[in-house]
Amino acid sequence: MNHFDTIIIGGGPAGMMATISSSFYGQKTLLLEKNKRLGKKLAGTGGGRCNVTNNGNLDDLMAGIPGNGRFLYSVFSQFDNHDIINFFTENGVKLKVEDHGRVFPVTDKSRTIIEALEKKIAELGGTVITNTEIVSVKKTDELFTVRSSDQAWTCQKLIVTTGGKSYPSTGSTGFGHDIARHFKHTVTDLEAAESPLLTDFPHKALQGISLDDVTLSYGKHIITHDLLFTHFGLSGPAALRLSSFVKGGETIYLDVLPQMSQQDLADFLEEHREKSLKNCLKILLPERIADFFTQPFPEKVKQLNLSEKEALIKQIKELPISVTGKMSLAKSFVTKGGVSLKEINPKTLESKLVPGLHFAGEVLDINAHTGGFNITSALCTGWVAGSLHYD
């Protein structure tokens, strides 16, 4: 039976970074992955370009991690988004920053990121075994035994980095939650996060239209980002981010011109009162959006009476949209819920119930926005879980 100091189950970003960290600290380390290649889900992030992190400050990170982000203060004090940027830069990956602080490889290829992680694992002497599905994990005395259908390994330290349950075709089947339950850990309810929104909005009229930096709001939750109208409802970063706060049955509000106040809009209409209403709004909005807003109103701006003008402005600034639901967990980008953080040491990510057992990445009850935040959480928790901690 092969013995290692540390075994990591799951070869996504958290697992690869945990392997690098563990190997860096001199541990004989094994990474086990069920797919043929490491980073299968990572390969599809950012439209295949791999939005590897976000270059914001700590407050930005906290805002980008709505699901228990404060748990990560200790993690980020050890390894944060700027350490991620330094790591890839020092390992030969040129990075660039795009809108909203999103960081990508200059190549615009996720393989660049995955290959840099794989190369570092090899350089540090980590062992990787792919195409291997784990069937059981148990602990006897001080040793964990990890078994596949035809092999077994032992270790003193076990790190579970199997991800959540979104996009199960990439390998995120929830197996890590089964391991957690086996060791008597609590797994909180799992649901879709960063999910497109299903709505009863007139989708076909606006299908395919994308808007930059509009505002979606629900109660105190206000998200300003890009939005895409689809055949089923709303997608794009604004909708994905708001999905963390709705389930279905809520009314959300869309402001397509957040940069203008209601008074600004009233002044603009008055300034262009001789124009047709459609041509007036086309100055500010895409033609099909302008068409949508002008349908119930008179043809000319100057023909609007006061109540019609107020109604038009209110529609543009506070368009009510009924949310009927979200895409299923399997079709969402992120899993909300996971291994309860009450049972995890925030400094080491070690189990409070089982010495030597650690969790990192999306298997934990932490959910972050797209835009580099979810991968940041995975990479940083992976590094910390793999590290050696001295009291």
Swiss-Prot record:
Answer yes or no on keyword Nucleotide-binding: yes
Q: Which domain of life is it from?
A: Bacteria
List required co-factors.
FAD
Keyword set, alphabetical order: FAD, Flavoprotein, Nucleotide-binding, Oxidoreductase
Effect of a null allele: Inactivation of the gene causes the elevation of the cytoplasmic levels of the prooxidant aminoacetone, resulting in an elevation of cellular reactive oxygen species (ROS) levels and ROS stress. The deletion mutant no longer produces H(2)O(2) from L-amino acids. The deletion mutant exhibits slightly slower growth than wild-type strain. Double deletion of both aao(So) and mutT is lethal.
Gene3D superfamilies assigned to the protein according to its UniProt record, in alphabetical order: FAD/NAD(P)-binding domain (3.50.50.60), HI0933 insert domain-like (1.10.8.260), Translation factors (2.40.30.10)
Q: What is its EC number?
A: 1.-.-.-
Ligand binding (FAD):
14, 33, 134, 362, 374-375
Q: Which GO terms describe its molecular function?
A: nucleotide binding
Q: Does the keyword Magnesium apply?
A: no
| Induction details | Constitutively expressed. Up-regulated in the presence of peptone. Part of the aao(So)-mutT operon.
UniProt comment concerning the protein's domains:
Composed of three domains: an alpha/beta domain corresponding to the FAD-binding domain, a beta-domain partially modulating accessibility to the coenzyme, and an additional alpha-domain.
Give the family from UniProt. Answer: Belongs to the BaiN/RdsA family.
What's this chain's function?
Flavoprotein that probably catalyzes the condensation of two molecules of aminoacetone to yield 3,6-dimethyl-2,5-dihydropyrazine, which is subsequently oxidized to 2,5-dimethylpyrazine. It could be involved in a microbial defense mechanism related to aminoacetone catabolism through a pathway yielding dimethylpyrazine derivatives instead of methylglyoxal. It has also low aminoacetone oxidase activity, and can produce hydrogen peroxide from aminoacetone.
The name of this protein is Aminoacetone oxidase
Organism, by scientific name, is Streptococcus cristatus
> What is the gene name?
aao(So)
